[in-house]
A protein has these predicted regions:
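Long amphipathic alpha-helical segments
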Residues: 1-121
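Short phosphate-binding/catalytic loops that engage adenosine nucleotides
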Residues: 71, 157-159, 208
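Short glycine/proline-centered loop/turn elements that form peptide/ligand docking sites
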Residues: 95, 148, 164-166
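A short, charged/proline- and glycine-enriched loop
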Residues: 125-132
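Short coil/turn segments
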Residues: 137-142
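Short helix-loop-beta junction
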Residues: 147-160
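Cofactor-cradling patches in redox/metallo enzymes
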Residues: 163, 167-224
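Peripheral docking tails and interdomain loops at the edges
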Residues: 218-259
Length: 259
C-alpha cells in the first residue's frame, strides 16, 4: 500500500492504549481541563483568533508565542484551531466578518497546523497502525476540520492518507488501489454528502475488502441527514466513536477470519 502521508512507526499501541489516548485528546477538545490550564488555553485562543486576521501574521511566530505562554502544540491543534474556526463561521453567519476575511483567517489557521506538524519531525515511514482514508470529494472546500482529524488520528498510531478536494473518481480509485480499514468522508454541504454516498455505494459494489465508512463534517450539525443512515456505517464527528468503531470492526474481522 502507498504509505504517503502516514505517521511514522513508533512503539506498537494496543487497542486500550489507543482508546485511552483518544480520551486524552477529547479532554482537551472539550475543555475538560483544570481551571488554570483551561484559562491559559482560552486566553491563547483569543489571541490567536485576532492574530490570524492581522496583517503581521506569521505561522512560526504564532506557534512560538502560544508555546511560550505554556500552551502545548497538541492543545493548539485539538482545541484552539477548531474553536477559532467555529467562531469565524459564526461571525460570518452573523455578518460580523466578510467571507474573504474568514477565508484568510482559516487559511492562517491551516498554516499554523502545518507548522506544528512540520515541527513534530515525523518522517514519512510505513507504520503498523490501521490504515484510514480521509476524503473530502470536490467541490468540498472546507478541509481544516479534516486536517485536524488527520493529525489526531496519526497521534493515535493510525496511518492516514488524505484525498481532499479531489474528484469522486480519484477517491474510489484510491480505495481500489489500496487496502483501508476505514474511509472517513468530510462534508459541509448536502452536495458533498450525496457525492460521498455515491462513492460508498460504488466501493461496496465493486470492492472485495470492505472498509468501515464514516460521514463527518459540519453538515452533521445542520440536521437533515437522518435519511442517509443506510449509506454510511457511522455518522459522527466524535473521535472516540471513530476510534472505537474501527477497533471493533477490526476485532470482528479477525474473529471471522479465524473461524
Amino acid at each position: 500500500m502507498d504509505r504517503t502521508n502516514q505517521r511514522p512507526t513508533r512503539q506498537k499501541l494496543t487497542s486500550g492504549d489507543i482508546q485511552g489516548l483518544a480520551k486524552d485528546v477529547l479532554n482537551v477538545a472539550r475543555g475538560n481541563l483544570n481551571p488554570e490550564t483551561s484559562t491559559r488555553i482560552e486566553s491563547a485562543s483569543d489571541w490567536l483568533e485576532r492574530y490570524c486576521l492581522s496583517n503581521k501574521y506569521d505561522a512560526s511566530t504564532a506557534v512560538d508565542t502560544l508555546i511560550s505562554r505554556g500552551v502545548h502544540a497538541n492543545a493548539i491543534v485539538d482545541y484552539c484551531i477548531p474553536r477559532i474556526a467555529r467562531i469565524y463561521g459564526q461571525e460570518w453567519s452573523n455578518d460580523s466578518l466578510s467571507f474573504a476575511t474568514v477565508s484568510v483567517g482559516c487559511a492562517h489557521l491551516q498554516l499554523v497546523l502545518k507548522h506544528i506538524i512540520h515541527q513534530r519531525g515525523f518522517n514519512v515511514l510505513g507504520g503498523e497502525g490501521k490504515c484510514i482514508l480521509l476524503a473530502a470529494p470536490a467541490p468540498e472546500q472546507h478541509t481544516l476540520g479534516a486536517l485536524v482529524l488527520a493529525d489526531q488520528l496519526r497521534r493515535l498510531d493510525f496511518s492516514v492518507k488524505m484525498c481532499l478536494g479531489r474528484p469522486a473518481e480519484d477517491v474510489t480509485k484510491t480505495v481500489f488501489e489500496n487496502k483501508f480499514d476505514a474511509v472517513l468522508f468530510s462534508a459541509s454541504s448536502l452536495e458533498t454528502v450525496k457525492i460521498s454516498a455515491q462513492c460508498v455505494n460504488l466501493i461496496r459494489q465493486d470492492y472485495a475488502d470492505q472498509p468501515v465508512f464514516f460521514l463527518g463534517g459540519s453538515f452533521l450539525s445542520s440536521g437533515g441527514h437522518e435519511g442517509m443512515t443506510h449509506d454510511f456505517d457511522h455518522m459522527t464527528n466524535k473521535l472516540d466513536v471513530i476510534v472505537n468503531s474501527i477497533e471493533s470492526a477490526t476485532v470482528m474481522l479477525s474473529e471471522v477470519n479465524r473461524s
